[in-house]
Amino acid sequence: MSSTKKPLVLTILDGYGHREEQQDNAILNAKTPVMDVLWQQQPHTLIAASGLDVGLPDGQMGNSEVGHVNLGAGRIVYQDLTRLDKEIKEGDFFTNPTLTAAVDNAVKTGKAVHIMGLLSAGGVHSHEDHIMAMVELAAKRGATAIYLHAFLDGRDTPPRSAESSLKRFTAKFAELGNGRIASIIGRYYAMDRDNRWDRVQLAYDLLTQAKGEFTADNAVAGLQAAYARGENDEFVKPTVIQATGEADAAMNEGDTLIFMNFRADRARQITRTFVNADFDGFKRDKVVNFGDFIMLTEYAADIKVACAYPPASLTNTFGEWLMKHDKTQLRISETEKYAHVTFFYNGGVEEPFKGEDRILINSPKVATYDLQPEMSSAELTEKLVSAIGSGKYDVIICNYPNGDMVGHTGDYDAAVKAVETLDNCIEQVVAAVKAADGQLLITADHGNAEQMRDPATGQAHTAHTSLPVPLIYVGNKAVKAVEGGKLSDIAPTMLSLMEMEIPQEMTGKPLFIVE
């Protein structure tokens, strides 16, 4: 069959960074005969996946959203974090028309301003500096009831690191003489993205009704009580913060609610719980008719509320360019990273392009992935191998979540198991690509599993790293690797391997030169 396509496959091993030291390195210490041989024998290079190279502030660790946007765009895409930092530094944030109107509306009607978000310096889903700027904006414009609902991190930050953030905000409210921290809860509940509505319900009830399993006089006391119960930041149970004599901070009709997370994937569920009239994830005991609900950035095109910083659109991303040249493509991953190989890889476009198929494999329903480090990789690999051999696709883009999702648990032995599982999967993918006479690129979006303990604190290292990631070529062309690349060079590399023109919007450079 002359129409059988020889696919170019991009396999993204999420959280699979490159680090030379063996100590606490789940990737180097795992038994990975397949990846070892590929690294020794195939054209390969290391590429940058963090900081300025991906449009983040200098030194900022990479993350999956940012990684996939850069992978698909073929140019450095300045991230919301960098954009917001700049807005605050230059003062434009404080005159943002959407934010100022929402605060002014609450002031005029004598209603409360509620600010919620991940109170963290992690910079992945939010940044506490942005939340601080929002508190200052509200106070400057005359809001008298400012309530901060703090989601705690411990995933993109050390597992027990929230105290300094809570102290910082407590001091700020004392200085303003107005406002307070009204609730604390771990992101495990407030920021679920896998339709575990029982978790989200606990967060929703805490926020709307000031109803939680625990109560404390102040946020630090609430946190310390959670630690005493054995809960790390990420898992802090819903805690109402209310000293004797303080008004309760339940959300009421006409109040303003501003959600300060800038990353979409873990902000969508709880936002829909607040704003969707037809919401059916659970029975909401209280539905609040807000004066204003503001999302900091656009969490999804179908969430119809005001947005302070709408997305800047990207043209001629890799997926769009393939469509314009009548190429077929497949995107495939598990639930945990499905949005990354579709929405984020397509530059924030939700709808598939013409000629783009998608396969979603359900991630296992376990509390944390150290309990099942292989996740759904067997089914994912089976579907991927079948697609490679189908002759249907010019390009296949796949993400294996294991290195990242298991790396986030901080469980070293589980991370080793995850990496060994991936090696077995890669063996099958390589064989399928060779059988189809195709080409394969293996890379990662950022590091994680190569650093499982924080040498400074001795705590488990659950966050991403700023280390480079591998890029390996397997295929039917003789190629030479170029040094000094970054994630945004991958799309131009793929087009060049397919002997296609590279659009002028893509400023990245090919990293494998055909000899």
Curated annotation (Swiss-Prot):
Pfam families in the cross-refs: iPGM_N (PF06415), Metalloenzyme (PF01676)
Cofactor(s) annotated in UniProt: Mn(2+)
UniProt keyword terms in alphabetical order: Glycolysis, Isomerase, Manganese, Metal-binding
Record text on cofactor binding: Binds 2 manganese ions per subunit.
GO-annotated molecular function: manganese ion binding; phosphoglycerate mutase activity
E.C. number(s) listed in UniProt: 5.4.2.12
Cellular component terms per the entry's GO annotation: cytosol
Tree of life domain: Bacteria
Residues that, per the record, bind Mn(2+) 1: D404, H408, H464
Residue positions of the active site: S64
GO BP, sorted A to Z: glucose catabolic process; glycolytic process
Keyword Transferase applies: no
Pathway participation: Carbohydrate degradation; glycolysis; pyruvate from D-glyceraldehyde 3-phosphate: step 3/5
Catalytic EC class: isomerase
InterPro entries: Alkaline_phosphatase_core_sf, BPG-indep_PGM_N, Metalloenzyme, PGAM_B_sf, Pgm_bpd_ind
Gene3D superfamilies according to UniProt: Alkaline Phosphatase, subunit A, BPG-independent phosphoglycerate mutase, domain B
Catalytic activity: (2R)-2-phosphoglycerate = (2R)-3-phosphoglycerate
UniProt binding sites for substrate: H125, R155, D156, R187, R193, R263, A264, D265, R266, K337
Binding site for Mn(2+) 2: D14, S64, D445, H446
Subunit structure, as described in the record: Monomer.
Described function: Catalyzes the interconversion of 2-phosphoglycerate and 3-phosphoglycerate.
PANTHER family: 2,3-BISPHOSPHOGLYCERATE-INDEPENDENT PHOSPHOGLYCERATE MUTASE
Family: Belongs to the BPG-independent phosphoglycerate mutase family.
Protein name per its UniProtKB record: 2,3-bisphosphoglycerate-independent phosphoglycerate mutase
Organism placement in taxonomy: Bacteria, Pseudomonadati, Pseudomonadota, Gammaproteobacteria, Enterobacterales
